[in-house]
């Protein structure tokens, strides 16, 4: 199933498709989630349990990392691993073969690290990642749009000789219900403010929030509200997860092909409704002879 997924999963949006592009760049987002698996000894040994406030969680968990096309919400590449694997480690395996020039990749503050940033930059993709507020980014040159240039270094580079220049965008969401949580800092390798103004990148970053719903779609809506994967061995859990990713891709592809001829952004269509329509049509498809 993994080999099939690697052949099938891909970006779908043609150039100019509504909601999929920013100044000629295909907008992508990186995000991860965890899924409960059946509480069997083999699954527990392979995937592991997350910690809990008292003891451990009731179920082992698999960690899933996905690269998502923002305009269509299709997962274009994925990595599946035991719970103990960090998202940064998984991303270091996933990104070199999947990021391409012409992409603009968004990611939240849990992903940034100098080594992963360097790996992602080497792909030729452009990046706009949120970073934690305690990351030291001294101002080196203030740009006309209020962003500024700084240099990031590997923490192991004691002599600070092999840094990379980044552009830093600081902003605060106004009139928010949670003002103490709404200070944002982005770093990007789009260094020219004329090509990507700070205000536009700040607005674009919040497209990333939408893809958090992608994992909800195949964790909940695609599985009829079942919260635990049914497979009882690690190999079958992996097959089940890749199968879910393929099913999600097929549904999202159908939604995109329904929206684009009408000039619509696929975001305007309901994933839940699409699943219901497909379920109604499946008996008809099964009746067609091969």
Language-model features and meaning:
Residues 2-8, 17, 22-26, 30-290:
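Single, function-defining residue in the core of a domain
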């Amino acid at each position: 199933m993994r080999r099939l997924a690697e052949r099938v999963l891909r970006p779908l949006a043609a150039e100019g498709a509504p909601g999929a592009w920013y100044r000629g760049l295909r907008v992508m987002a990186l995000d991860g989630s965890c899924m409960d698996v059946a509480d069997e000894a083999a699954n527990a040994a392979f995937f592991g349990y997350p910690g809990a406030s008292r003891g451990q969680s009731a179920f082992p968990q698999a960690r899933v990392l996905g690269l998502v096309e923002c305009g269509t919400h299709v997962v274009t590449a994925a990595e599946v691993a035991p719970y103990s694997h960090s998202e940064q480690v998984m991303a270091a395996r996933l990104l070199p073969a999947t990021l391409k020039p012409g992409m603009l990749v968004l990611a939240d503050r849990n992903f940034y690290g100098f080594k992963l940033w360097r790996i992602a930059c080497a792909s030729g993709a452009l990046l706009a990642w949120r970073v934690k507020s305690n990351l030291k980014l001294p101002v080196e040159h203030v740009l006309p749009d209020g962003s500024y240039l700084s240099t990031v270094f590997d923490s192991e580079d004691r002599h600070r000789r092999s840094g990379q220049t980044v552009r830093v965008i600081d902003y605060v969401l106004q009139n928010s219900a949670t003002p103490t949580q709404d200070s944002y800092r982005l770093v990007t390798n789009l260094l020219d403010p004329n090509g990507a103004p700070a205000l536009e990148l700040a607005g674009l970053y919040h497209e990333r929030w939408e893809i958090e719903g992608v994992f909800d779609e195949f964790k909940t809506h695609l599985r009829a509200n079942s919260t635990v994967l049914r497979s009882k061995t690690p190999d079958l859990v992996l097959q089940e997860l890749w199968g879910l990713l393929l099913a999600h891709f097929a549904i999202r592809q159908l939604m995109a092909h329904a929206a684009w001829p009408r000039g619509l952004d696929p975001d305007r269509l309901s994933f839940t409704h699409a699943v219901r329509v497909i379920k109604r049509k499946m008996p008809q498809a099964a009746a067609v002879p091969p």
